């Protein structure tokens, strides 16, 4: 099978700077998004995800400008997420040079928006971000639910059923983040990754918890993910993209080297 | 000398234009103006989203007739990208069946559902990511690009051309061999996104800019 598994560095951007929260607190500054994106492009990243975590509406214009600048210099796919709520938001980001948009909260509050967006722009550019948290106790059959607001607000929605529903509505890809693991460096939640990857027909990106290269291998081989997303292991120079790709290829995973 | 990226309201125009500007000093315009399109020395026909919307937007902007006229005249190089490649075929089975521009004989088909590879691993649709492109026939647009180089794809429908001579590149997915690079005369079209395929993609665009069919 020649289709390569993808490595996607993620840029969490707040008011024009790349940041990475540890469990969404203790933010460290990691630089100018355009420079960071260019570095990853040169290193051979397969895609870049730009996650706008800017809280204030006034700073949203900065995001569009950043996306335009990245798209002008980086010729690999770019996904933009954060605050995508309307078809106009999607049109703005696609016109700025994004290839895909990632819908998160709006998918939970208005699931039909996913359908509308997929009908209008095509499923291939609609990513639905799923933030899942384990709700079953140790020893019980594992169960995960959807959480919003950075993992603080439970919705009562079963994560696997939700994933299926999003794909039925037209999601072309799922960005699955384990809210238990995000920022912990303890590795992906393989259980939820496998459960969702097996349940849906579209690609699944595993996210949340990467601390070393074995975690990336496990995400693909055990979790069944089509792509792996990581931020801090790359931002702070612990590993480069080529390190990660070589390591994954050595473990029998088809990669673009 | 101007390269016109045809703007009919669909498609990733910014990315394509930026990538072209990266490989040429020629003027690159994004336009829906028929005079600019007629006056351009080269055309890019992008496409993104559902093909029914792409075709109806092309019609709504009075551009379908113009594009067909240009294709018939065989006067200037045209590069189709993604749905732009698909639109050059006779028809697509997307959206319950959509007639297309009919420049090349053949159709656009869906990959299918519930696909699995030989190991039983679920195959995902859309076909998304970096896959190898086998160069079936030599073409000036392949100059400097290795046979089997990887390009970035994202699509759920693929081109099946009728005539082998129109097929310049294929990939392998889901046990199928989609015709991911097609063309005839001054027209070349690719399913993958050269503007998103890093070095090899930029090379293909550069080859297009320098192509004198």
Swiss-Prot record, chain A:
One of its GO terms (cellular component) is cytoplasm. InterPro entries: Aldolase_TIM, His_biosynth, HisF, IGPS_HisA/HisF, RibuloseP-bd_barrel. It catalyses: 5-[(5-phospho-1-deoxy-D-ribulos-1-ylimino)methylamino]-1-(5-phospho-beta-D-ribosyl)imidazole-4-carboxamide + L-glutamine = D-erythro-1-(imidazol-4-yl)glycerol 3-phosphate + 5-amino-1-(5-phospho-beta-D-ribosyl)imidazole-4-carboxamide + L-glutamate + H(+). Its EC number is 4.3.2.10. The keyword Oxidoreductase does not apply. Keywords: Amino-acid biosynthesis, Cytoplasm, Histidine biosynthesis, Lyase. SUPFAM superfamilies: Ribulose-phoshate binding barrel (SSF51366). GO terms for biological process: L-histidine biosynthetic process. The keyword Iron does not apply. The active site is at residues 12, 131. It is an enzyme of class 4 (lyase). One of its GO terms (molecular function) is lyase activity. Pathway: Amino-acid biosynthesis; L-histidine biosynthesis; L-histidine from 5-phospho-alpha-D-ribose 1-diphosphate: step 5/9. It comes from the Bacteria. CDD domains: HisF. It is found in: Cytoplasm. Belongs to the HisA/HisF family. IGPS catalyzes the conversion of PRFAR and glutamine to IGP, AICAR and glutamate. The HisF subunit catalyzes the cyclization activity that produces IGP and AICAR from PRFAR using the ammonia provided by the HisH subunit. Heterodimer of HisH and HisF. This is Imidazole glycerol phosphate synthase subunit HisF. The lineage of its organism: Bacteria, Pseudomonadati, Pseudomonadota, Gammaproteobacteria, Oceanospirillales.
């Amino acid at each position: 099978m020649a289709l390569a598994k993808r490595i996607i560095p993620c840029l969490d951007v707040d008011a024009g700077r790349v940041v990475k929260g540890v469990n969404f607190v203790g933010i460290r500054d990691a630089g100018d998004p355009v420079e960071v994106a260019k570095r990853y492009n040169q290193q051979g990243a397969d895609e870049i995800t730009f996650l706008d975590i800017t809280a204030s509406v006034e700073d949203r214009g900065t995001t569009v400008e950043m996306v335009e600048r990245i798209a002008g210099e980086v010729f690999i796919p770019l996904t933009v997420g954060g605050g995508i709520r309307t078809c106009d938001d999607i049109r703005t980001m696609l016109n700025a040079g994004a290839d895909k948009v990632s819908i998160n909260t709006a998918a939970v509050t208005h699931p039909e928006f996913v359908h509308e967006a997929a009908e209008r722009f095509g499923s291939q550019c609609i990513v639905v971000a799923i933030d899942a948290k384990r709700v079953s106790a140790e020893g019980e059959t594992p169960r995960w639910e959807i959480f919003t607001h950075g993992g603080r607000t439970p919705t009562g929605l079963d994560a696997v059923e939700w994933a299926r529903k999003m794909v039925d509505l037209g999601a072309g890809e799922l960005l699955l983040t384990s809210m238990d693991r995000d920022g912990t460096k303890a590795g992906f939640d393989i259980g939820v990754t496998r459960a969702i990857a097996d349940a849906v027909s579209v690609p699944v990106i595993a996210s949340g918890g990467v601390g070393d290269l074995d975690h990336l291998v496990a995400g693909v081989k055990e979790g069944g993910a089509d792509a792996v997303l990581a931020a801090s292991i790359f931002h702070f120079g612990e590993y480069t993209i080529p390190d990660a790709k070589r390591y994954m290829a050595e473990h029998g995973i088809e990669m673009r080297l | 000398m101007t390269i016109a990226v045809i703007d009919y309201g669909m498609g990733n125009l910014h990315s394509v234009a930026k990538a072209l500007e990266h490989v040429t000093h020629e003027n690159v315009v994004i336009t829906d103006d028929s005079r600019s399109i007629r006056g351009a020395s080269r055309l890019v026909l992008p496409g993104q989203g559902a093909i029914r919307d792409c075709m109806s937007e092309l019609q709504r902007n009075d551009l379908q007739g113009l594009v067909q006229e240009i294709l018939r005249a065989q006067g200037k190089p045209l590069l189709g990208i993604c749905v732009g490649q698909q639109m050059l075929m006779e028809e697509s089975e997307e959206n319950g069946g959509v007639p297309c521009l009919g420049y090349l004989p053949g159709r656009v088909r869906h990959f299918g559902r519930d696909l699995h590879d030989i190991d039983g691993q679920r195959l995902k649709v859309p076909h998304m990511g970096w896959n190898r492109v086998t160069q079936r026939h030599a073409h000036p647009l392949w100059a400097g690009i290795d046979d089997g180089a990887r390009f970035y794809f994202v699509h759920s429908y693929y081109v099946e051309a009728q005539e082998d001579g129109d097929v310049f590149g294929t990939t392998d997915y889901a046990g199928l061999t989609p015709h991911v690079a097609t063309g005839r005369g001054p027209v070349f079209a690719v399913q993958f996104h050269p503007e998103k395929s890093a070095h090899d993609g930029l090379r293909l665009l550069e080859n297009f800019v320098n192509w004198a069919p």
